[in-house]
Amino acid sequence: MGKIIGIDLGTTNSCVAIMDGTTPRVLENAEGDRTTPSIIAYTQDGETLVGQPAKRQAVTNPQNTLFAIKRLIGRRFQDEEVQRDVSIMPFKIIAADNGDAWVEVKGQKMAPPQISAEVLKKMKKTAEDYLGEPVTEAVITVPAYFNDAQRQATKDAGRIAGLEVKRIINEPTAAALAYGLDKGTGNRTIAVYDLGGGTFDISIIEIDEVDGEKTFEVLATNGDTHLGGEDFDSRLINYLVEEFKKDQGIDLRNDPLAMQRLKEAAEKAKIELSSAQQTDVNLPYITADATGPKHMNIKVTRAKLESLVEDLVNRSIEPLKVALQDAGLSVSDIDDVILVGGQTRMPMVQKKVAEFFGKEPRKDVNPDEAVAIGAAVQGGVLTGDVKDVLLLDVTPLSLGIETMGGVMTTLIAKNTTIPTKHSQVFSTAEDNQSAVTIHVLQGERKRAADNKSLGQFNLDGINPAPRGMPQIEVTFDIDADGILHVSAKDKNSGKEQKITIKASSGLNEDEIQKMVRDAEANAEADRKFEELVQTRNQGDHLLHSTRKQVEEAGDKLPADDKTAIESALTALETALKGEDKASIEAKMQELAQVSQKLMEIAQQQHAQQQTAGADASANNAKDDDVVDAEFEEVKDKK
């Protein structure tokens, strides 16, 4: 069995890890970094850049550089959170035909799973380069508070990237695995506070050890899938824009290039303010008007940043209370607090969390790498490389169906351990009703319309009977990935209807297959491009070395040969400017054929140089027989 890699597919950064024996190892990417920016860029010449190369060119290509795509995955265009992003993102967010939030790049509509697949492909390639073998299986993490549609979309992204997603696990649970694996014995209850680039989760997890086997049981989870570092950046960007407008009278929001520069500067300033009390946002030539170029130079103190984002930090505290309440615990029952996600490096966040739990969070967990390490550990559990570890996760939101009067009837309550299965018998609302519609919902509200619709299906062929008589058994089955399968059965006729919830939104099978084929075609195009570049380099080298040999041969090269070589050199030079690998190879072959005489002359010259070198060495050897005498200076006595 091959390796199952662990991938933390983050909003801002992603990370990949593997099990090296029984030890998890975070892998460095091609740029030598342990984390990769979750940024994808589509350049003017049709190239797709991922990670640091994409980030570097963002300033000059803001409309075609996509970031924070995880905030759109599995979401509807009309969602309030998506509408907030539409107004602030430099790229174009659009409504797909099915109402999902998609992105338009260079006139082409793209689904978030398709874009996220580019990041996953880079993670896959990083692992393959390290292992020296193909990788086809992965454990991918998602925020604990992701709903069914978002989990399904993440699995789709894995498939498009050429990965079989063996398990979807929750980020805080993965972090707990990374933390708890090498810690001492005994039972502990931990709180994992995960504030990443775009999402926030809190999970209360109990780690029990019985006879050497560790059980990681999630007691409760809560969160906000639209709260993270990107929101903190936005607050600082808005402040800088307003300050500049006050000072210069120019609104930078109308200038995408300036906004992209400002985004980078704001992120940098936010990071600096975690260790410094103040920083300068200094952006020369940020824009220009009729009077000339304008420069931005604004001082930002840590206190100012904290005042801008205080409500965001406070927003993360309410879910902590709910999670503890759901787990039936109080603050004093928590043994350790673990911080995950880059935004937890902010001192204010650490202070608020410490105040809430009444204890300092642990500092021995790397907030950027813990989730990927935990995913790799789960991969090791699935392959059998990691033994004596049992993971019991929960479903984050209640699941149920719409019943008479537009009410949501819950079948599986939130924080139920998964996998799980639950059945309930319902009946008809009208006399002689021959069909029922099962409308599947996810959420905590009583009114069906206020919850997330996961999809609906019909059960036909019910035998005519008075209302309330037919018995329709509805079964909800949640697998270990947290993905829901629903069936409805008429107990009288035995008729049954089943669906795996693929949200009324989401990608259908044909779309996924098309994207998989596109990704494979792109991989083939990438391979051909790589081969073309290698051939070009060989051609360049041959061009340079042949010209040098012609120069060195001088008059020894017959005029006819020289003319033929010059002609072949020109032909190769022209071919190198094109995109045809076969043409370059043919011109290289022609040059090699007409350069026979030149090669002979070069070999003769080389042989002569070697002979001359040997003679010089022999003379030096003779000189070696001379004994050096030591002289002492004797001064005449005056």
UniProtKB/Swiss-Prot annotation:
Region (Disordered): 602-638
Amino acid composition bias (Low complexity), ranges on this chain: 602-620
Annotated keywords: Acetylation, ATP-binding, Chaperone, Nucleotide-binding, Phosphoprotein, Stress response
A Pfam family this chain is assigned to: HSP70
KW Electron transport (keyword) present: no
InterPro entries: ATPase_NBD, Chaperone_DnaK, Heat_shock_70_CS, HSP70_C_sf, HSP70_peptide-bd_sf, Hsp_70_fam
Transmembrane domains' residue ranges: none
Residue numbers carrying Phosphothreonine: 199
Induction: By stress conditions e.g. heat shock.
GO molecular function annotations of the record: ATP binding; ATP-dependent protein folding chaperone; unfolded protein binding
Record flagged with keyword Nucleotide-binding: yes
PTM-bearing positions, type N6-acetyllysine: 109, 245, 304, 421, 556
Domain of life of the source: Bacteria
UniProt record similarity statement: Belongs to the heat shock protein 70 family.
Function recorded in the entry: Acts as a chaperone.
Protein name per Swiss-Prot or TrEMBL: Chaperone protein DnaK
Species whose genome carries this gene: Escherichia coli O9:H4 (strain HS)
Gene: dnaK
